[in-house]
From Swiss-Prot:
Gene Ontology terms for molecular function: iron ion binding; superoxide reductase activity
Entry's family note: Belongs to the desulfoferrodoxin family.
Classification via SUPFAM superfamilies: Superoxide reductase-like
Catalyzed reactions per annotation: reduced [rubredoxin] + superoxide + 2 H(+) = oxidized [rubredoxin] + H2O2
Pfam families for this protein: Desulfoferrodox (PF01880)
Organism lineage: Bacteria, Thermotogati, Thermotogota, Thermotogae, Thermotogales
Function, as annotated: Uses electrons from reduced NADP, by way of rubredoxin and an oxidoreductase, to catalyze the reduction of superoxide to hydrogen peroxide.
Taxonomic superkingdom: Bacteria
Keyword annotations from UniProtKB, A to Z: Electron transport, Iron, Metal-binding, Oxidoreductase, Transport
Enzyme Commission (EC) number: 1.15.1.2
Originating organism: Thermotoga maritima (strain ATCC 43589 / DSM 3109 / JCM 10099 / NBRC 100826 / MSB8)
Binding sites annotated in the UniProt record for Fe cation: 15, 17, 45, 51, 115, 118
Protein name: Putative superoxide reductase
C-alpha cells in the first residue's frame, strides 16, 4: 500500500476538494513568481468545525530532476470552534495560499490538500522557465 493510492484528482470545476493552482504558464528565469492555491474556488468547500480543509502543501518538480521539492505547508487551524460549541467561534480560516518563488528551471507545480472528511486531493500545473 502506498500513500499515492489514497490521493484523489478531479476537474476542479466539478469537485470542491481539488486545489486550484493559479500561476503563469511562462516565466523568466529567476523572476519572482506568485502562486495562489485555493480549495473551493469554483464550488465552495464547507468551512465548519465538522468539515473543513486542514492544510495545503505546494511542491515543485523540476523537469528532468528525480526529486520533488516542497515549497511550503500551510495549515488552516480555525474552523468556528468555541468553548460554547461548534461553528460559533469568532474566526474561520479560508483554504487559500499565496506564495512567491523564483524558478531557474521549467517544471510542474503540484498542490496537495487535505479535507478532514474526504482525505487527500491533488492537482498540478506545468510552468515553463524562459531565459
Amino acid at each position: 500500500m502506498k500513500l499515492s493510492d489514497f490521493i484523489k484528482t478531479e476537474d476542479f470545476k466539478k469537485e470542491k476538494h481539488v486545489p486550484v493552482i493559479e500561476a503563469p504558464e511562462k516565466v523568466k528565469k529567476d523572476e519572482k513568481v506568485q502562486i495562489v492555491v485555493t480549495v473551493g474556488k469554483e464550488i465552495p468547500h464547507p468551512n465548519t468545525t465538522e468539515h473543513h480543509i486542514r492544510w495545503i502543501k505546494v511542491f515543485f518538480q523540476p523537469d528532468g530532476d528525480p526529486y520533488v521539492y516542497e515549497v511550503g505547508r500551510y495549515e488552516f487551524n480555525a474552523h468556528g470552534e468555541s468553548v460554547q460549541g461548534p461553528n460559533i467561534g469568532a474566526v474561520y480560516t479560508e483554504p487559500t495560499v499565496t506564495t512567491v518563488v523564483k524558478l531557474n528551471r521549467s517544471g510542474t507545480i503540484i498542490a496537495l490538500s487535505y479535507c478532514n472528511i474526504h482525505g487527500l486531493w491533488e492537482s498540478s500545473q506545468k510552468i515553463t522557465v524562459e531565459e
